[in-house]
Amino acid sequence: MNSKTHLLLALTMLIWAGSFIFIKIGLKELDPFNLAFYRFLLASPLLMAWVFWKRGLAKPSGSEWLHLSVLALSGVTLLYAFQFLALKYTTATNASILINTSAVFVALWGLVKGEANPRKLAGVFLSFAGVVLIVSKGTLEFFSSKTIFGDVLMIVDGFLWAVYTVLGSKMLLKYDHETLTAYAFALGTIFLIPFALMSGFANPVTFNPETVAALLYLSILCSVFAYVVWYYALTNADSTSVAVYVYLVPLFTAIFAFYALNEKPDFFTAIGGIITIAGVYLTTAKQHQ
């Protein structure tokens, strides 16, 4: 991996870490469903235009639209509806750690299919222990934690991302990552409309500058620029080397949250985060021969 790719990946992790902060900022004025809807309403046409300019858009067949719809529902609509709702009830740091449970769910799916090995099993159990520490705050009174509802939603979010990953891997036999993501964004935006209607559409003309800045950051930087850079890196380096960078996101998020939101991670969040990320690394790292 060359130095340019290293720098771009580090920048991408900084941007994704900042997303948890800007979601918190956007939630000051907008409800979670409106924030998610407007984020992808802005991001979808931009990513579609990029893919069309770069290589043109492949036209899905009739049955493929159903598969794409399931992907969009799991990986965009429900994923971000739950994530934004979760961030009303949990900290940015907790959210950035718990979303990584997606790798554990993917590993569990592999175990169900008989792809078990001691390293992956150890990673699953280690991650589970870390998650329990974060959510319980080290007490047996598990459900007394102030962040329990948001934490559980983020674990559900991890499961949804795992569903998207597993189902999406089959579609990648025909479509490249960027095209698949562009279609998922577009369909996911449409499926977010009922959620926004349910909570009442917010009038974008009345948004304050903070909310506009949050939406621009989440849509242009997080959903378009960062994804384009991520897929660029995947074509210029092996996937394991690229994936390791994701483990920087919770660290960057904790630093940003401390200064921007005055969030102070407690001892159990810090230790639980380290254990969770270590477990995720064990489940995803390639075995050396």
From Swiss-Prot:
Its main location: membrane. SUPFAM superfamilies: Multidrug resistance efflux transporter EmrE. The keyword Chaperone does not apply. One of its GO terms (cellular component) is plasma membrane. Keywords: Cell membrane, Membrane, Repeat, Transmembrane, Transmembrane helix, Transport. InterPro entries: AA-Vitamin_Transporters, EamA_dom. The chain crosses the membrane at residues 7-27, 33-53, 65-85, 92-112, 123-143, 148-168, 182-202, 212-232, 241-261, 265-285. It is found in: Cell membrane. Residues 14-136, 159-285 form the EamA domain. Pfam families: EamA (PF00892). It is a multi-pass membrane protein. Belongs to the EamA transporter family. This is Uncharacterized transporter AF_0510. The lineage of its organism: Archaea, Methanobacteriati, Methanobacteriota, Archaeoglobi, Archaeoglobales.
